[in-house]
Amino acid sequence: MKREILLERIDKLKQLMPWYVLEYYQSKLAVPYSFTTLYEYLKEYDRFFSWVLESGISNADKISDIPLSVLENMSKKDMESFILYLRERPLLNANTTKQGVSQTTINRTLSALSSLYKYLTEEVENDQGEPYFYRNVMKKVSTKKKKETLAARAENIKQKLFLGDETEGFLTYIDQEHPQQLSNRALSSFNKNKERDLAIIALLLASGVRLSEAVNLDLRDLNLKMMVIDVTRKGGKRDSVNVAAFAKPYLENYLAIRNQRYKTEKTDTALFLTLYRGVPNRIDASSVEKMVAKYSEDFKVRVTPHKLRHTLATRLYDATKSQVLVSHQLGHASTQVTDLYTHIVSDEQKNALDSL
């Protein structure tokens, strides 16, 4: 979603919210939480407060009038009723007869509410230096996590990874084979952004950065000589990330055409640009998602940018057998998240043995 559209939607939701949610928003913006995260949280609060009004828990006329005392006095039974409402209510999508939202969606809603309650009961300070209230009902609410072993998850993911020669094979396909399948009109459109598209995909495959980290890169964040990029990780932490050498020619080719192709000025600091009505703008995450989906589906299997992150992590673990190194590369504080890649690599080794 383009940043301008995202901010517009955030503003519309903020206009609906009670004063204490607006304080929460401002506080998390200072952390900083990303605008995307805050937008998703505001949507969850809109869903929750709408239910509060519909269920009669508050007799306020509108969401912005719901007093803080409603949250303070919310019972565990009330929260469980809300969860049941989410699980059993008819979906808004008229094309399905499925009842309720998924457990993943419910967990996301509860996570957003837990964050708000933690702020109100622990983090915020009133005039006396105390939180607004102390009773946190969310600590009494249990969530059900999706049960899946690492082995099962590895099996599901590995078919969507570009391992071994497929990493550079994917880039070569986009560069040389994909254009041959296009009509003259489609080829003209492809050539306008070919260098940029290849540079973005090469960077994702060579660094393992998150999509948000890649699209938020500025020109100054790329050190092509050292093959290092400076990114803003989750929670606003800055980090320097090494980039594999195979991405260098793709980045060089893009930088060679960036200024002229995208009509840049000194104020255009974003590394990856798109041209809209002759004006350069930072490329947005949804555009990259669509681009990766299109090229990957034509090459092998439709994947997301996050699967390119998994690809880099798996290849790096296969080469080093070091979960610590992989954790550092991905920006994780713990090696627990990288356990997945040991299972994927073990399966790959077994397949190699079976072929002997």
Swiss-Prot record:
Describe the function of this protein.
Site-specific tyrosine recombinase, which acts by catalyzing the cutting and rejoining of the recombining DNA molecules. Essential to convert dimers of the bacterial chromosome into monomers to permit their segregation at cell division.
Similarity comment: family membership: Belongs to the 'phage' integrase family. XerS subfamily.
Q: Where in this chain does the record put each Tyr recombinase domain?
A: 169-354
Q: Which UniProt keywords apply?
A: Cell cycle, Cell division, Chromosome partition, Cytoplasm, DNA integration, DNA recombination, DNA-binding
Q: Which InterPro entries match?
A: CB (IPR044068), DNA_brk_join_enz (IPR011010), Integrase-like_cat_sf (IPR013762), Integrase_catalytic (IPR002104), Integrase_recombinase_N (IPR010998), Integrase_SAM-like_N (IPR004107), Recomb_XerS (IPR023670), Tyrosine_recombinase_XerCD (IPR050090)
For this entry, the protein name equals Tyrosine recombinase XerS
Q: Which GO terms describe its cellular component?
A: cytoplasm
Q: Which PANTHER family match?
A: PHAGE INTEGRASE-RELATED, TYROSINE RECOMBINASE XERC
Q: Does the keyword Cytoplasm apply?
A: yes
From the broadest rank down, the organism's phylogenetic lineage runs: Bacteria, Bacillati, Bacillota, Bacilli, Lactobacillales
What is an example of a Pfam family matching this protein? Phage_int_SAM_1
> Which residues constitute the catalytic centre?
R210, K234, H306, R309, H332, Y341 (o-(3'-phospho-dna)-tyrosine intermediate)
- Source organism superkingdom: Bacteria
Q: Which SUPFAM superfamilies match?
A: DNA breaking-rejoining enzymes (SSF56349)
Q: Does this UniProt record's set of keywords contain Cytoplasm?
A: yes
Ranges for domain Core-binding (CB) come to: 16-121
Activity regulation summary: FtsK is required for recombination.
User: What are this entry's molecular-function GO terms?
Assistant: DNA binding; tyrosine-based site-specific recombinase activity
One example of a Gene Ontology biological process annotation: cell division
Q: Which organism is it from?
A: Streptococcus pneumoniae (strain ATCC 700669 / Spain 23F-1)
